[in-house]
Amino acid sequence: NIQSYHHFMSVHLFSHVDIKPENIFIPKGDLMNDEVNDHCQKYDQKISDLGGIDFQLLGIGRTGHIGFNEPGSNYDSLTRRVHLNYITRNDARKSFYGIENVPTTAITMGIKTIRKSKRIVLLAWGQNKSSVIKKAIENEVDSNIPASFLQKHSNVTFVLDNSSSSELTRIKSPWKVGSCNWNNELKAKAVIWLCDITKKSILKLTESDYNENNLSELLLHQTTYEINLEIFNKLQRTITGWPGGKPNFEDTYRPERSNPSKKRVLIFSPHPDDDVISMGGTFDRLVSQGHEVHVAYQTSGNIAVSNSDVLKYVEVYESFSNKKDKELTSILKFNNEILNNKKIRKIAGLIREKESLGATRFVGIPDSNVHFLKLPFYETGSVKKSIPSASDKEIMSNIISEIKPHQIYVAGDLADPHGTHKVCLDIFFDVLQNLKSEKFMKDCWVWLYRGAWHEWQVHEIDMSVPMSPNQVLRKRKAIFYHQTQKDNVMFQGNDNREFWVRTEDRNLAIAKKFRDIGMPDYAAIETFKRYHF
């Protein structure tokens, strides 16, 4: 069964290593009810008979589960059948084409069986694991976070990436655990953190605030006044209503150059909606200020159109043209899974193209400035994508070389649950390395945007583009042109809000954050980080 963990492990691990089939032992998931207990007991006995587990490799779920030991699991639990938590099932819905198809029960190795392993390594990556990683490592041992039981093991290692480790004290606020090597970004991070702790704006922070919150080290070389003013100015200078640079204006302390006054701008959008979701206000501002703006949609996004949406458009066409495709409509009516059907994928891709054109026309750029790249790595017809090839890089390289942009905007939002953003960014970085020696690239600046899944931290921001209430509404309307991505989205991630709601909430939250630390009061703000190459 392609939706079983037998299949998952085979595709993602066993097919890549030289393991013998007879050395693979996975609990059976197709047993009758009266067979389960006996099977679980024999499974544990088999482990014992073979001398126990020398090395155990684990993942961790957002509930803190290891294996399928959900919150509330007993410290001495053995292999058994368990009821799956809603969050666990919701996280698996992509693989099962909807939560309604995800099993409600599973067989799991127990906590006692796991902790008997001589060596344990737990892997985690991604922003959505950061909160539970902090609880598992730093909080008290708690059965509601089963991974926290590993604190009692004498030989365990957590292997984490930057995102999953971001909430750990040693990463988020390292000044609380020891001396720091202070750079400008870390200093800004500390001061903004202090504002949060004290509920004060930057210019109201006192020497006592620093001393009482583990930040006295900052006062060794600067006064409180000097630090406050330095960080205040740093953040204030990120704010601009001119994302393409303000013409004929002194730009020493502005995030973008004033010249050339009219720039060629290239926005890379991994899916056909990320541009307006993540930087719709800035996109609109660049166009209204007279820059030559191009958008390049890197993938077709075709698998993100539901069969019911494709069917709707097919039926409209059939009614208009008096042409019928009974086989196609039958397939669409009676399947709710992703279909590897070239005709369906082509229709879905066209739907997303026309939605994109609706949005870009609303913003005000000509159709000739809209480029559908259809990168080949994406066109597998399934959630699993191909490894990017030279063809993907060539397509990206060609569009950059053709436009010769002064600005490139790229999605740096790596919390995308199905990884397309990361793949597109990796392709871009490879292309950038090959192109950076070109003469036109000497005048090109690269800006990374976020917003679809999470936002830049304030201390990371290099450019902040405020929006008025009217601009917030225009951005919302641009997003609404992507109708198939508005309701019942195929790849929602862990956030059940609609994309326009979540990005608007983030833009409003950033504006509030700026207001709280003493910056002007804006309706909303989009943020960017400059990538130096």
Name each model feature, range by range.
Residues 20, 125, 467-493:
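A charged, well-structured terminal subsegment
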Residues 447-466, 470, 499-515, 524:
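PAPS-dependent sulfotransferase catalytic core
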Residues 2-193:
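Conserved phosphate- and dinucleotide-binding cores of soluble alpha/beta proteins
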